[in-house]
Swiss-Prot record:
<protein>
    <recommendedName>
        <fullName>Homologous-pairing protein 2 homolog</fullName>
    </recommendedName>
</protein>
<dbReference type="Pfam" id="PF07106">
    <property type="entry name" value="TBPIP"/>
</dbReference>
<dbReference type="InterPro" id="IPR036390">
    <property type="entry name" value="WH_DNA-bd_sf"/>
</dbReference>
<dbReference type="GO" id="GO:0120231">
    <property type="term" value="C:DNA recombinase auxiliary factor complex"/>
</dbReference>
<dbReference type="GO" id="GO:0003690">
    <property type="term" value="F:double-stranded DNA binding"/>
</dbReference>
<keyword id="KW-0233">DNA recombination</keyword>
<keyword id="KW-0469">Meiosis</keyword>
<dbReference type="InterPro" id="IPR036388">
    <property type="entry name" value="WH-like_DNA-bd_sf"/>
</dbReference>
<dbReference type="InterPro" id="IPR040661">
    <property type="entry name" value="LZ3wCH"/>
</dbReference>
<dbReference type="GO" id="GO:0000794">
    <property type="term" value="C:condensed nuclear chromosome"/>
</dbReference>
<dbReference type="GO" id="GO:0010774">
    <property type="term" value="P:meiotic strand invasion involved in reciprocal meiotic recombination"/>
</dbReference>
<comment type="similarity">
    <text>Belongs to the HOP2 family.</text>
</comment>
<dbReference type="GO" id="GO:0007129">
    <property type="term" value="P:homologous chromosome pairing at meiosis"/>
</dbReference>
<feature type="coiled-coil region">
    <location>
        <begin position="79"/>
        <end position="147"/>
    </location>
</feature>
<dbReference type="GO" id="GO:0120230">
    <property type="term" value="F:recombinase activator activity"/>
</dbReference>
<dbReference type="GO" id="GO:0000709">
    <property type="term" value="P:meiotic joint molecule formation"/>
</dbReference>
<feature type="region of interest" description="DNA-binding">
    <location>
        <begin position="115"/>
        <end position="179"/>
    </location>
</feature>
Length: 214
């Protein structure tokens, strides 16, 4: 490693250890800095050993493991009251973290329910079948309404009940489809219109149909 690269690596690692102010192994530092700074494992090990030899960082040996950390003498002393304030901040942040993790798990569970209920292909097939069934019942209902004495009150009530049931199913499936699409579109790089065109989705609006009022 050239002098310039060695100096750059020393500066990067020293700043990182001082900023983080916590113990690290050479593997930890390599993993955390390699992506952003392109430091090799050998260079990291050598640089940290040199920094420790020069007294710029501290080194502790635990069996075969070496741990490095910032020289604490460079930092100002902290009073008891400041330590209590820091402890309070840690407690508050830990509580917020737990709350955020709980919310995240809940959202992941909701997303899993949405994505596992029906696949896009199954949903589209189901919507198509329901539309066809609704059309048949609408046609049947129209004929019944136009008739005079050909339908008994019981038959008429049955048809109205079926119409109400299938209209509710239509609304329910439409909400389910909307929820699934919204979940998919959160990670989809294009617009909703482009997604619908790519998978061949036709909405009620595309077909100029609306859910009847019941």
């Amino acid at each position: 490693m050239s002098k310039s690269k060695e100096a750059a690596a020393s500066s990067i690692i020293l700043k990182y250890l001082n900023d983080q102010n916590r113990p690290y192994s050479t593997q930890d530092v390599f993993s955390n800095l390699q992506r952003d700074h392109g430091l090799g494992k050998t260079a990291v090990v050598k640089t940290m050993e040199l920094l420790a030899q020069k007294g710029k960082i501290k080194e502790k040996v635990y069996g075969k493991q070496k741990i490095y950390f910032a020289d604490q003498e460079q930092f100002p002393s902290v009073s008891d009251s400041e330590l209590k304030d820091l402890d309070a901040q840690v407690t508050e942040l830990s509580s917020k973290l737990q709350s955020s993790q709980q919310s995240c798990r809940q959202l992941e569970s909701e997303l899993k329910d949405l994505t596992s209920s029906l696949t896009t292909e199954e949903m589209l097939k189901e919507v198509s079948c329901l539309k066809e069934e609704c059309d048949r019942h609408e046609h049947k209902l129209t004929n019944i309404k136009s008739a005079t004495n050909h339908v008994t009150p019981a038959e008429k009530e049955k048809v109205y009940g079926e119409r109400k049931h299938f209209c509710k199913e239509w609304k329910k499936r439409k909400r389910m489809a909307t929820d699934i699409f919204d979940a998919i579109l959160e990670g989809y790089p294009k617009s909703k219109k482009q997604f619908f065109e790519e998978v061949g989705v036709e909405t009620d609006e595309d077909c100029n149909v609306t859910v009847p009022d019941v």
